[in-house]
From Swiss-Prot:
Tissue specificity of this protein: Testis specific.
Subunit comment: The 26S proteasome consists of a 20S proteasome core and two 19S regulatory subunits. The 20S proteasome core is composed of 28 subunits that are arranged in four stacked rings, resulting in a barrel-shaped structure. The two end rings are each formed by seven alpha subunits, and the two central rings are each formed by seven beta subunits. The catalytic chamber with the active sites is on the inside of the barrel.
Transmembrane segments: none
Gene3D superfamilies xrefs: Glutamine Phosphoribosylpyrophosphate, subunit 1, domain 1
Known role: The proteasome is a multicatalytic proteinase complex which is characterized by its ability to cleave peptides with Arg, Phe, Tyr, Leu, and Glu adjacent to the leaving group at neutral or slightly basic pH. The proteasome has an ATP-dependent proteolytic activity.
Organism taxonomic ancestry: Eukaryota, Metazoa, Ecdysozoa, Arthropoda, Hexapoda
Organism encoding this protein: Drosophila virilis
N-terminal signal peptide: none
Predominant location category: cytoplasm
Protein name: Proteasome subunit alpha type-7-1B
Cellular component, GO annotation: cytoplasm; nucleus; proteasome core complex, alpha-subunit complex
Annotated GO biological process: ubiquitin-dependent protein catabolic process
Length: 245
């Protein structure tokens, strides 16, 4: 890497190399988010933790406010900075306006912060892609994704990180079924099935959270994940038998 690659204002062919390096860091994990009429489900691939490690300190789904959560793919240390900044901004909004911040407001705040770091001297872009899900005051479910470059989009279902294209193929292939998802259980199954395409079928490697309107964020228990994985295994066997000549 030449010294020009490290500069924030020298580039060629429209490529910001530092941003592209940050995009590569995002490939260190996989996340999936799905929005239905009743809930928002966030799922993330995680490494198995040591038996002596406290589980809550390694979680990759973080609460931003009572009605909002965020998960991420990329550098965990960078993500913790963004989570902390988002939490402070959400609480500041409550104190100043006596109402919760909208999901898009926090997403815009994070996107603006990320974009600022692509133009700052002696700083590097955040190597994190975030999925932010939650509910607005009117009960509308929202799901947003931000990139290291600072751009953001809203989605009904999306994935970021490692094998993102493979997971997206599953989501696009099952768009009709996902759009008709009636409840949280069905939504959770779709998210776990999507993560299954990117990771081993093991409850210890998956973290799942469900957000509902005016309800506490639910972190899905390992027993529930075990049950969902059992259902998915059975469905996979049935599909294989159906396709067999």
């Amino acid at each position: 890497m030449s010294r020009f690659d490290e500069s924030v204002n020298i580039y060629s062919d429209g490529h910001l190399l530092q941003v592209e390096y940050a995009q590569e860091a995002v490939r260190k994990g996989s996340t999936v988010g799905l929005r239905t009429k009743e809930c928002v489900v966030l799922g993330v691939e995680k490494r198995a933790i040591d038996s002596l490690q406290i589980e809550r300190t390694s979680r990759k789904i973080k609460k931003i406010d009572q009605h909002m959560a965020m998960t991420f793919a990329g550098l965990t240390a960078d993500a913790r900075v963004l989570v902390s900044r988002a939490q402070v901004e959400a609480q500041s909004h409550r104190l100043n306006f006596d109402r919760p911040a909208s999901v898009e407001y926090i997403t815009r705040y994070l996107a603006r912060l990320k974009q600022t770091y692509t133009q700052s001297v002696a700083r590097r872009p955040f190597g994190v892609s975030c999925l932010i899900g939650g509910f607005d005051e009117d009960g509308r479910p929202r799901l947003f994704q931000t990139d290291p470059s600072g751009i953001y989009y809203e989605w009904s279902a999306n994935t970021t990180g490692r094998l993102g294209q493979t997971v997206n193929e599953y989501l696009e292939k099952n768009t009709a079924a996902i759009s008709r998802t009636p409840d949280a259980a069905s939504a959770m199954k779709h998210v776990v099935r999507a993560l299954f395409t990117a990771t081993s079928l093991d409850p210890a490697s998956i973290e799942l959270a469900v957000l509902r309107y005016w309800q506490p964020i639910e972190m899905v228990k390992p027993e529930t994940l075990e049950y969902l994985l059992g259902v998915i295994k059975q469905e996979a066997v049935e599909e294989a038998l159906t396709k067999a000549p």
